[in-house]
Amino acid sequence: IDMEYASAAKAGIDVRFEAKATRLLTDDRGRVTGLLVRTPEGTETINAGAVVLAAGGFGGNPEMRTRYLGANWELARVRGTPYNTGDGIRMALDVGALPWGHWSGCHSVQWDLNAPWHGDRKVGDNFQKHSYPLGLMVNVKGERFVDEGADFRNYTYVKFGRTVIGQPRRTA
């Protein structure tokens, strides 16, 4: 990481820690001119010729998951990081950016009901986060709700994740 800091310093980029961006600033024409940040010392305005929003998606935000993915998604466990809260997306939308792309789709997989709410960021087999067991899947009512043999597992596991979350108690 030292090389990245050196490259940033050489390019005149100021790297800050404990500075949470809270709002994009714009001029009268709507061009982004900087941002507002919150630090332990208070709020600060940073003027900039360019702002890069590299803040991840909204997978760690239950409200945004429900808004864009649908019912029951606020209850989904997050396979990855809890820090992708959609703040960068929200800031862009707040200043007039247009949502573009496929917001109603996601990479969803079945996951152990007792797994942690967010990914443990360790590789291991404690909780299988990428698959489902071979066999029949039934919901809590004992009803079969998918054709487990519709295709190879690599082509069905994401599709089945969305199907499971629509079942009673989002459980199979």
What is each model feature region?
Residues 1-49, 89, 95:
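Helical element adjacent to the flavin cofactor pocket in flavoenzyme catalytic cores
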Residues 1-23, 63, 71, 135-144, ...:
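Conserved N-terminal/central alpha/beta ligand/cofactor-binding core
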Residues 18-20, 35-40, 49-50, 54-58, ...:
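Fold-independent oxyanion-binding glycine-rich loops
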Residues 27-30, 52, 64, 70, ...:
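A generic structural micro-environment signature
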Residues 38-39, 46-116, 156:
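Glycine-rich loop(s) and the adjacent beta-strand/alpha-helix scaffold that form part
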Residues 39-40, 80, 123, 130:
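Generic detector of short alpha-helix boundary/capping microenvironments
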Residues 89-172:
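An anion/pyrophosphate-binding glycine-rich loop and adjacent beta-alpha core
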